[in-house]
Each structure stands twice: as structure tokens, then as C-alpha cells.
Amino acid sequence: MLVTKLAPDFKAPAVLGNNEVDEHFELSKNLGKNGAILFFWPKDFTFVCPTEIIAFDKRVKDFQEKGFNVIGVSIDSEQVHFAWKNTPVEKGGIGQVTFPMVADITKSISRDYDVLFEEAIALRGAFLIDKNMKVRHAVINDLPLGRNADEMLRMVDALLHFEEHGEVCPAGWRKGDKGMKATHQGVAEYLKENSIKL
């Protein structure tokens, strides 16, 4: 489990948003001001994967406005990533997504993030990494279960709230909601006002 630990850094080829290939793309050199969202999908040209990739891509600006870059990874080569980007959505492609697509052809990144499944493909892992390279949130889904990009945005908001105010974010917390002081009195006050909504 990587939560609370430093995210494994890596250097690998990546197809960038402008379709150029960076042969030495490094996670640590591509964080946003506040961190990054690193997410894995099993394989290009498959089924649930394009829905997740398009969903994250549609929210790239939302993540960037909060200071987080989105970075995607699969075990495919940069050539396969490029071909998938250049396949129209109506033909099962992903179109011109704007975030970097890392080529984990050695499977070492998937292995380091503990998402490598049967030494073949990555499970649907997503990691919220802060500006200090610390993993603050992780979710790993089985192959048939797609992830929710809006939930990752909610977790980004929660982390930013905690960093700014020092308050923890209770169950179901959304941006604009009250946080909670991490004390016995803080939880008692919060539950008195909010337990019915939980």
C-alpha cells in the first residue's frame, strides 16, 4: 500500500498532449503546483478504458486549476498510445486527449504502484500525489469497474482544504462544506450538527 508513502518516481517514454514523444518523461518533473493525479488503465484499444480516459481528459482543466497535473499510464508502447489518440471517438478511439500518456512497456511502473495484474496488464489504479510526492489517496478497481473522475476531484478538494485549514474532511465532504477539527470536541460538535446528513 502506497498511501502515506512517497510515490515511486519513474522515467519512461510518454506521448504528450501535443502528440510529441518525451523519451524521458519523469513523474517528479511533471507535478503541478500542488501535485498530480496518476492513473493506470489496463490496455489501449479496449472497452472501459476509453470512457475513463475521456472522463479524466474532460476534467484536466479542473485539476490544473487546483494545481494538479493529470498523467496516465498503461503497458502499451508510445506508438500504440499515438495510434489510439489518432483514432476517432466514434471508432473506439480516445481522440486528442491533452494529458501525457506514459508507455510502461517494461511494466516496472505498474509493478512499483502494485497494480500489475498477473504480470500482464495494470488494474485500474488512481493515485493522488501531493507536491512533496507523497501518496495521499489511492483507489484500485478490478477490470470491469470504471472509476469516477469527479470523485478524484472531490479528493483533491479535500486535500487542499486540509492543507489550507488544518481540518479533516468527514464522510461525503464536498468543497464548501464545513471541515472538522481532529479532536474529541471537534468530532462531537460536527456530529451534533451533521450526523443526520451522513
UniProtKB/Swiss-Prot annotation:
Reaction equations catalysed: a hydroperoxide + NADH + H(+) = an alcohol + NAD(+) + H2O
InterPro entries: AhpC/TSA, Peroxiredoxin, Peroxiredoxin_AhpC-typ, Peroxiredoxin_C, Thioredoxin-like_sf, Thioredoxin_domain
Cellular component GO terms, alphabetical: cytosol
SUPFAM superfamilies: Thioredoxin-like
PROSITE patterns referenced in this protein's UniProt entry, alphabetically: THIOREDOXIN_2 (PS51352)
GO biological process: cell redox homeostasis; hydrogen peroxide catabolic process; response to oxidative stress
Residue positions of the active site: 49
Something else known: The active site is a conserved redox-active cysteine residue, the peroxidatic cysteine (C(P)), which makes the nucleophilic attack on the peroxide substrate. The peroxide oxidizes the C(P)-SH to cysteine sulfenic acid (C(P)-SOH), which then reacts with another cysteine residue, the resolving cysteine (C(R)), to form a disulfide bridge. The disulfide is subsequently reduced by an appropriate electron donor to complete the catalytic cycle. In this typical 2-Cys peroxiredoxin, C(R) is provided by the other dimeric subunit to form an intersubunit disulfide.
Function: Thiol-specific peroxidase that catalyzes the reduction of hydrogen peroxide and organic hydroperoxides to water and alcohols, respectively. Plays a role in cell protection against oxidative stress by detoxifying peroxides.
Name the UniProt record assigns to this protein: Alkyl hydroperoxide reductase C
Biological classification of the source: Bacteria, Pseudomonadati, Campylobacterota, Epsilonproteobacteria, Campylobacterales
